[in-house]
Amino acid sequence: MNDLTGFQRDLLLIISGLDEPKGLDVNEEIEKYYGTEIQHGRLYPNLDTLVEKGFVTKGQHDLRTNMYMLTNHGKDEIKAHLSWTWSYIPDELKAGLTDSTLGTQTQ
């Protein structure tokens, strides 16, 4: 596992679920999830860290707006983290997960 914070992993997940999101799109989603305002001074340095570590690429949407895309390295990190997380979820909790909570039906 890489040395990512929980906040950075949450950003990766958000970026993976959106189509070339702009920084403001990512900010809107993370604020919804956390239920609080996220300051730009927290968001953008963490996005830059994800770019520097090769998990995300940053491109220009227009002259003032950046967009973010997950790299293969970022996809691998998400898969590894989800696999690790899943290994610690008790079977009785796994059995209760449905399409609406996980995206797939479990037995």
Give, region by region, the residue ranges found by the protein language model.
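Basic, amphipathic "hinge/linker" alpha-helix immediately C-terminal to the N-terminal HTH DNA-binding motif
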Residues: L63-L82
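Short, contiguous hydrophobic alpha-helices characteristic of membrane insertion segments
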Residues: M1-N2, T57, G103-T104
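Beta-hairpin "wing" of winged helix-turn-helix
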Residues: V51-D62, M69
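Amphipathic alpha-helical dimerization/coiled-coil segments
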Residues: K79-Q107
